[in-house]
Amino acid sequence: MSGVVPTAPEQPAGEMENQTKPPDPRPDAPPEYNSHFLPGPPGTAVPPPTGYPGGLPMGYYSPQQPSTFPLYQPVGGIHPVRYQPGKYPMPNQSVPITWMPGPTPMANCPPGLEYLVQLDNIHVLQHFEPLEMMTCFETNNRYDIKNNSDQMVYIVTEDTDDFTRNAYRTLRPFVLRVTDCMGREIMTMQRPFRCTCCCFCCPSARQELEVQCPPGVTIGFVAEHWNLCRAVYSIQNEKKENVMRVRGPCSTYGCGSDSVFEVKSLDGISNIGSIIRKWNGLLSAMADADHFDIHFPLDLDVKMKAMIFGACFLIDFMYFERSPPQRSR
């Protein structure tokens, strides 16, 4: 009896395996959801869709459910979301342009000029060109046309070749193309070349601008009149009959003040509107980034509004366009 060693009671084989098997460090697999995860702050609990016994966790939405956040695909691994959609623009993303709502077509109105029917003043903002500041290379002018609500009405772009721009500078002939929110060219302004080296008072040397709306159909002209003291222009119809006059200040190079060009009737008594070149401080003195305010009556004929609008660009090229060599002196 003394030589017999007591033994423990025998246990089933299954219990022995459970005791000797080391614990699995991997957690159980998460439950499978037939849904898409959306980044961003968790929203309110979404009621369960038809066919699901219970609600889904916060931040999960079924594919059939509309959500307020777009779906994003992870790029280059898992990274935190630094920009919430709709909050701030992403890096290298241009700011969207707010356009003026497009009006309905009107009878007896050239297509594209319906915007001017609703306005009594517009702002002409020239783009700042850093290349012209750093070099002597003249670039094509670009302008943004906006209303009082800072909504874009038109975009004006110069279409002149490099040789003509840099050879003739401010005296260059040019073509300005006016486009709307759909990118359609609704107006064209052309300035022919005029030689002013022989006699500035000669009729053949006077500047002229032709306005076409739609392109190819002339609606009027802006013609310069020689005057010893001030800038004087005539706004003419398609038959070159004088309709209005534009009278500028005695000095258009006033520093620290606005330059006002008054639009008057032919007899000079009635004041119809104005073209004001705004003084923008050092930016006006050093760069070609002019700002014009154009005012006209709300009930003025839309073609005459377009002619006053066109006169603004002829004034800009003749008196406020600074070539790079002149600015460096």
From Swiss-Prot:
Q: Where on this chain is PPxY motif (motif)?
A: 30-33
- Annotated localization: Cell membrane; Nucleus
Catalysed reaction, written as an equation: a 1,2-diacyl-sn-glycero-3-phosphocholine(in) = a 1,2-diacyl-sn-glycero-3-phosphocholine(out); a 1,2-diacyl-sn-glycero-3-phospho-L-serine(in) = a 1,2-diacyl-sn-glycero-3-phospho-L-serine(out)
Q: What is the effect of changing residue 277 to A?
A: Markedly reduces nuclear localization
**Positions in the Extracellular compartment:** 321-329
Q: Pro residues bias located where?
A: 39-51
The cofactors it requires, by name, are: Ca(2+); Mg(2+); Zn(2+)
Q: Which GO terms describe its cellular component?
A: nucleus; plasma membrane
The name this protein carries in UniProt is: Phospholipid scramblase 4
Species: Homo sapiens
Taxonomic lineage from the root: Eukaryota, Metazoa, Chordata, Craniata, Vertebrata
